[in-house]
């Protein structure tokens, strides 16, 4: 009924907002449709295809839930797998950027998938899976920061190199992010 409509509407709304937001990463958002043509070499293109496929796979399930049709859930399982694929392709957009050593490693997909599983469990009110997901997420974040720090140091990165100011001397933070103590 209407509860299913609201939940599916929320999911579809967030997915569409995410796709629209992603189109602003492009140099010219009017050319967003061209992003679909590079699926053989571009993780961004694969993400676009995966997201559209996921939305299309889940549309019959959403319609069945909303109208109480009781259609078989097989397509829903395929849609769930497609959701994982979409989040994985999104993570690979970041993981393949060699210029950012903290991202250019295996921990990025692990972190994204942990966020996905934990968020899904929380939104669906699944207490034990949400707790397990939070623990997995903590482990994934710890691994990400540990591996990222090593990768950053291995490449000899510094604040000066990151800002391009290393040719002038040692770079430092001009002003701290806040001026009063934390609570």
What is the predicted function of each stretch?
Residues 40-42, 50-183:
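Long, contiguous internal "core" modules enriched in hydrophobic/ aromatic residues
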Residues 1, 7-31, 47, 51-65, ...:
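Transmembrane-helix bundle segments that line or gate the permeation/cavity pathway
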Residues 2-4, 34-40:
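Perimembrane loop-to-helix junctions flanking transmembrane segments
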Residues 27, 37-40, 44:
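Generic, ordered loop/turn and secondary-structure boundary motif
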Residues 24-26, 32-33, 95-96, 112:
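Broad hydrophobic/π-residue packing in well-ordered secondary structure
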Residues 2-9, 111, 130-131:
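Alpha-helical transmembrane segments and their helix-start/interface "positive-inside/aromatic belt" motifs
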């Amino acid at each position: 009924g209407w509860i299913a409509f609201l939940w599916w509407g929320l999911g579809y709304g967030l997915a569409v907002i995410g796709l629209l937001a992603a189109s602003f990463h492009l140099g010219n958002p009017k050319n967003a449709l061209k992003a679909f043509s590079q699926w053989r070499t571009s993780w961004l293109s694969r993400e676009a295809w995966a997201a559209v496929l996921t939305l299309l796979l889940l549309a019959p399930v959403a319609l069945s839930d909303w109208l109480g049709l009781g259609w078989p859930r097989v397509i829903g399982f395929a849609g769930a797998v497609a959701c994982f694929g979409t989040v994985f392709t999104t993570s690979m957009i970041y993981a393949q950027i060699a210029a950012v050593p903290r991202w250019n490693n295996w921990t990025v997909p692990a972190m994204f998938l942990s966020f996905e599983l934990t968020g899904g469990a929380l939104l669906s009110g699944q207490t034990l899976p949400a707790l397990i997901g939070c623990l997995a997420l903590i482990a994934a974040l710890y691994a990400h920061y540990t591996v990222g720090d090593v990768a950053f140091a291995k490449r000899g990165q510094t604040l000066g190199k990151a800002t391009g100011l290393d040719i002038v001397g040692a770079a430092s933070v001009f002003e701290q992010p806040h001026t009063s103590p934390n609570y």
